[in-house]
Structure formats: C-alpha cells, structure tokens
Amino acid sequence: MKFFHLSDLHIGKQLHHYNMIAEQRDILGKIVALAEREKPDAVLIAGDIYDTPVPSAEAVSVFDEFLTALNDLEPEVTVCIIAGNHDSAKRIDFASDILAKHRVMIAGMPPVTREETIRKVSFFDAYGEVCIYLLPFVKPSYVRNLIDGDITTYDEAVRLVIERENIDTAKRNILVSHQFYTAAGREPETSDSEIRMVGGIENVDTAVLEPFDYAALGHIHRKQKIGRVQNRYCGTPLQYSVSEAGDEKTVTMVELLEKGSEPHITELPLMPMRRVRKMIGHLDEILNAAAEDNCHDYVSITLTDEVEAYQPKEKLEQVYDHILEIKIDNERTRKILEFSEEEVESLDPYDAFVTFFQEMNGRAMTEDEDNVIRTVINGEKEVAECCLLYTSPSPRDLSTS
C-alpha cells in the first residue's frame, strides 16, 4: 500500500499581517499534481486542517477545491482526515457520512462513550489487509466517560483510547493522530508557529504507538521521526514562521509492504510561491541582494549598520513587498539590552529617555527635542497627580471612617 502523509495545513493562516490563502491554494494544487503522478492509494491528513475553529468561507472553499481535485483522480484515491487542536471537531465532522460514500473518511471526535471505538478504514493489497485508525486530537476531558476513574493527563487519555481497541497485530496497522508525542522524555523539534502548553502536560509517550506499523502524526510543524522510524511528523506544507526559514517542506510518501518490514519513506519536495527568508547585513547590502527570485518572498530583515540609516523601512519596502519584520542589531541596540530590569525601573523617566535617545541616535537631543520630552513627561505627572487627588480620601472622609 502506498499513501501520502500530510498534516497541519492551517488553511486561513496569516503570517504576521499577510493572508496566505493564495500560497495555500497553490501548494495544495501542487500536492494534487504529486498525487496524480505517484498514484497513492490514500492521502492521510493528520489534523489542523484550518488555522481556527471557525474558518472563513474562503478557507473552506480552498479545502473543498483540494478534496474535489483528489476525488477526481484516477485511479481512485481515498482521503482520511482527523481534526487537530486548531479545528472544530463538529465542523470537521459535518457531512462525514455522505462524504464517506465518496472515499473521504473523516473523524472529528475521538470515542466519548463506552460504545464508541476509533474509526477504522480498511485497505487490501497483495499482502493482505491494512487497518487505518483515525484518532482525532484527544484531551482528557473528551474521554472522561470511558472509565469510572479520573483521567488527568494527555498521556493517560490517549493510552486509554488506544488500549480499548482490539488491534490485530498480525495485520498491518496505521494510526493517524494529532498529539505532542515524546520518546522516553525526548521532545520533538518545534518552531515558533506552534502553540505549546506549559509544563509538558500535553506530552504523550510514543510507547503507546507500539502496535502500529506506521504512525502518521500531526501537530509538530517540522518533519521528523520521534522514537522509531515508523513514528513520523510530516510537518507543514508551507513555512509558517520566521523560525522555519530554511526548512524544506515536503510531502511524506510511505509504502507498506509485507508485515514486519520497515516502511519505505520518500520525501517529495514542495516548491512554495514564496519562501520565508532571513536577511542580515547593512542596508545597502540587503537592498543590493534583491533579485527576481526573492523580492516577493516573506523576509525578516536585521540591519547591522552602526550609523543610523535614513528611512530604511521605506527603502526596503520599495524592493521587498512582503516584509515580516525589520530589526536592528548594532552596538547601540546591544547596549540597551545590557540594562537590567532593576536598572531601568530605578531611572527617572526623563533620564531613561535621554539615555535611550543617545544610544539609538549617537547624539544628544537638541533643545527643541528636550523641551518636547520635558513637556510630555511633566504632563503625564500632572495627570497622575490629578488622578491621585481625585481618588484620595478627604480629611472629612478620614474623620468619619
């Protein structure tokens, strides 16, 4: 059996203030083209279809186009979808019975009653049956009715749901899951585009994945194995943060042969409309580095000029049309970072601003600039004193209290 492993489409996502819907429509079209070429039996999508629980009409339309294009392929392709933590389980489940008749298998919610089990989809090839278990994002509160005792951790919740299943380990079994898996305490490599919970409470140990010949995982945005080679995060199809600059995005294609053999894994490169790039250097260097193949990319720019550049933002925007951020890294900015929080809090507001101005501009303020700052600071003090006078108790109030 051959299948594509996708996850974390995050359709409708914005990168800083840029709408990425055009890039997402483009990359999904390229995935369809790869499916037409490689002819997988199935496409597994391991959660976070959308970026928000209530996606826009445009985002829903883009995913509809993707499913329709996959459904039109010959030979037929089955699509298996689970909900991730960004998705609304009920919205993902909408029309799932009708869609199943068109080879689109959806699981929005994990089992929540004792009668329910994980949704299973079966395939048959020359080596026998392949069982695909569709396990959506699980929280302890979702599955608390499955047993009489308490379930307090994500690890307990996922383990409970999987161990209830009657999994035939003589067959080839695949799990599609969207959780934060760790291997003997080792966490996967993350990026800035992911939402993490404090204290590791979302961690699920990969030991629970042992019954499966392949675990198609979602939730982590960088492609990687976690523990065994069979446990894989495929990563996002696009770069969704500056921290992912330089990451090569791919479609994970997996072939399962006879039971007991390792899966054959191939990473099919994806070429985005726009890459995320980091550019570091003097203003003139970055302006001169502009070329037809990068001026439309998403760029994070760090300027290292020691002498203050004139209107750097305006100049850069004339060359690069998708600037994510402009930062300054030079001797002056590094000195500012050397101030401790206690030192900053102990400074008089006027003295603090004078120090800041001199460090940023390499000169003292002019008389006019000094007068403006003194007026602003004195005005703030007067407002604060008025507020204090207005809210303080009068002597009469104190005498009667």
Language model region names:
Residues 390-395:
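Conserved small/polar residues in nucleotide/adenosyl-binding loops
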